[in-house]
A protein has these predicted regions:
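A non-transmembrane, solvent-exposed segment enriched in polar/low-complexity residues
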Residues: 23-180, 184, 191-195, 200-202
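N-proximal helix/coil linker or "cap" segments that precede and/or mark the start of modular domains
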Residues: 275-337, 342, 347-352, 378, ...
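C-terminal motif of bacterial Sec signal peptides marking the signal peptidase cleavage site
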Residues: 17-20
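Alpha-helical repeat scaffolds
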Residues: 206-219, 256-266, 294-303, 332-333
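Structural microenvironment flanking redox-active thiols in thiol-disulfide oxidoreductases
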Residues: 368-406, 419-425
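Short, internal strand/loop/helix patches
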Residues: 337, 400-434, 440-441
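Thiol-/selenol-based redox modules, centered on thioredoxin-like
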Residues: 437-467
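Conserved redox-active cysteine motifs that mediate thiol-disulfide chemistry
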Residues: 350, 358-375
């Protein structure tokens, strides 16, 4: 199509850069490398350096820190304070200083020392990525395929043009950094494109959806199995999204659940040892967090396939932690007040299957589920089950108002202490909405059950009612 002629040329040019530059494989001598500085307004007294290393270092009460370590690999490392990553390009032997306020440091960090030009651009690059993100994700991901592709590639053009213009004004980048930046932009675009099918279907559950046969052509020339690319921020995110995309949008056969398919796909499709270690670890971690019941089916294979001792130990620790929430275990006790002020305990619900929704009025994904939850309640109203919603709102007035104004059905409770409430701690809840199925006997059936919008929920509840 004519409107894509320029974009096609640009992508061809970027692809040439992407696949002809090999300088990231340059071998460096191990050298003492120093990263120091001051990060104010942080609540944490620990700063971590990730990349080819995993280092934790103390920060004093003023936010000052100093990391001195031996490195032999150049790349875009990540400094992490609390949950805030700060990307830093480091070459072995560098001495780099960074200052800023934790609240704005991702887009306003100040650098001094070696590779200032590259690191200043990383700050600019993160700002530009935020600026070029769509303002309305709903309308962005519900575009028709051709329009969506054009929008995404327009953003890529801006990112590529900006780094070229920056170098004209401020001098050429280090060759390794320049190559990694090209890779970063390509992987970033691929992640957005791979998100399209799942977001479109989530936002348009009533619409039929099918990708064109050529939609995934952007993956054909992308390196999916490269240890050196692990030093590029978006590569790890790309790997995980690539795995999800391949499983969801192909006819890959194999046993359910999806995590077993993912394990099989990693085993067959990846050769690099370190990449496989990371993928096995991430798939297992995701499985534990989303379905400890499924994770139990994988742990034996994981222990055989995982060659990284640190990853092996960490996953087994997670399994032990989550084992209290396995199917058949007694559901952890809770006792909270309802709208009418009466206290409802989990023991009061024995004899019926209970579908629990842990939510909050400020949680947008929670609110998206409400129409589906209402439909589910209506469809199953003649069954022997209870729909229980537990809010972790800090604002009880907002909670009461929403439940009454929306005429929400079922039993509604409010958990005291929001994220520090017992139900959050006992059920290992890190994000909401979280759905839980408890059997008539008070034992767990699924501690991380499908959402009401899921195609799986009706069959799972039907099975629970029949047990």
């Amino acid at each position: 199509m004519p409107k894509y002629t320029y974009l096609a040329f640009l992508l061809l040019f970027v692809s040439f850069l992407f696949f002809s530059c090999k300088e990231q494989h340059k071998i460096y001598r191990q050298a003492t490398t120093i990263i120091e500085g001051q990060i104010t307004s942080a609540n944490s007294n620990i700063i971590s350096l990730y990349g080819d290393v995993d280092i934790k270092s103390p920060m004093n009460q003023d936010g000052k820190f100093r990391i001195s370590t031996e490195l032999n690999k150049a790349g875009i490392y990540s400094l992490l304070v609390e949950t805030q990553p700060i990307y830093v390009f480091i070459v072995p032997g560098d001495k780099i200083s960074i200052t800023g306020d934790i609240r704005t440091i991702a887009t306003e960090a100040k650098f001094d020392g070696d590779h200032v030009n590259e690191n200043n651009y990383l700050v600019r690059f993160e700002s530009l990525k935020l600026e070029t993100q769509p303002e309305n994700l709903d309308s962005f991901f519900t575009q028709q395929e051709d329009d969506f592709i054009a929008t995404v590639e327009s953003r890529t053009t801006k990112l590529n043009t900006d780094q070229q213009e920056y170098q004209k004004k401020n001098g050429l980048f280090d060759g390794v950094f320049a190559d990694m930046l090209v890779h970063e932009i390509v992987y970033d675009e691929a992640v957005v494109k791979m998100n399209y099918p799942s977001y479109f279907k989530y936002l348009n559950p009533e619409k039929s959806f099918k990708l064109s046969d050529t939609y995934d052509s952007f993956l054909q020339n992308i390196d999916t199995d490269s240890e050196s690319n692990l030093m590029i921020p978006s590569y790890k995110k790309f790997l995980l999204m690539y795995l999800e995309f391949k499983i969801q949008n192909s006819s890959i056969s194999g046993a359910n659940p999806a995590y077993i398919k993912k394990f099989n796909f990693v085993q067959k499709s990846f050769q690099n040892k370190k990449v496989k270690e990371i993928l096995f670890y991430e798939v297992m971690k995701q499985s534990i967090n989303e379905s400890i019941n499924d994770a139990e089916l994988l742990i034996s294979d994981y222990n055989k396939l995982q060659t990284n001792e640190v990853y092996l130990a960490e996953i087994n620790d997670m399994i032990n932690k989550w084992s209290i929430l396995l199917k058949g275990k007694k559901a952890p006790h809770f006792s909270y007040k309802a709208l009418n002020g009466k206290t409802v305990r989990i023991e009061d619900l024995l004899g019926k299957v209970v579908y629990i929704d842990v939510w909050a009025t400020w949680c947008v994904p929670c609110l998206r589920e409400l129409p589906f939850l209402e439909k589910l309640q209506e469809d199953l109203k003649n069954n022997d089950m209870t729909f229980l919603s537990i809010s972790i709102d800090n604002d009880q007035v907002a909670w009461r108002s929403m439940v009454k104004n929306k005429k929400m059905k079922g039993i509604h409770l409010i958990a005291e202490n929001d994220w520090k409430s017992n139900i959050v701690a006992d059920y290992l809840i890190t994000d909401i909405p979280r759905f839980i199925i408890i059997g008539r006997d008070g034992n767990i059936i699924n501690s991380n059950a499908p959402r009401p919008s899921s195609e799986k929920i009706r069959s799972e509840l039907t099975e629970a009612l029949g047990s």
